[in-house]
């Protein structure tokens, strides 16, 4: 394979990995530990 192909696949895989990690953190089990600043703020 050419270097550009390997580099492109590596960058695409990294972006997919970051996206999956962000979705897991936002909607998966770790989301229970996140606080909602709008619920914490009292008027």
From Swiss-Prot:
It comes from the Bacteria. Keywords: Membrane, Thylakoid, Transmembrane, Transmembrane helix. It holds the Pfam family PsbN. InterPro entries: PSII_PsbN. The keyword Lyase does not apply. HAMAP family: PSII_PsbN. May play a role in photosystem I and II biogenesis. PANTHER family: PROTEIN PSBN. This is Protein PsbN 2. It comes from Microcystis aeruginosa (strain NIES-843 / IAM M-2473). The lineage of its organism: Bacteria, Bacillati, Cyanobacteriota, Cyanophyceae, Oscillatoriophycideae.
